[in-house]
């Protein structure tokens, strides 16, 4: 389900397929994000939103699911940046 979609400038692997894993396996997002951190990976945020929209979710609902998980795992600063960029 998970696959690489590239690398960040600081060498972390960008992972896609997270929404599908979250939906099909029922794993909490913060658990998934913690696992990615331990593997020097980061979510493909745009792909997460695209998968969720493809499943019929509206952007506000998607962001409300991401908000606490990003804040708990990566901190409020990164949460603010990610959510701002996803809102466009």
Where are these regions (language model features)?
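A glycine- and charged-residue-rich anion-binding loop/surface
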Residues: 1-88
């Amino acid at each position: 389900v998970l696959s690489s979609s590239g690398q960040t400038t600081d060498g972390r692997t960008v992972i896609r397929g997270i929404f599908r894993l979250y939906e099909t396996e029922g794993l909490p997002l913060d658990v998934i994000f913690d696992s990615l951190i331990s593997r020097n990976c980061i979510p493909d945020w745009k792909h997460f939103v695209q998968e969720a929209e493809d499943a019929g979710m509206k952007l506000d609902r998607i962001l409300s699911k991401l908000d606490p998980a990003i804040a708990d795992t990566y901190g409020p600063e990164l949460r603010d940046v990610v959510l701002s960029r996803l809102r466009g």
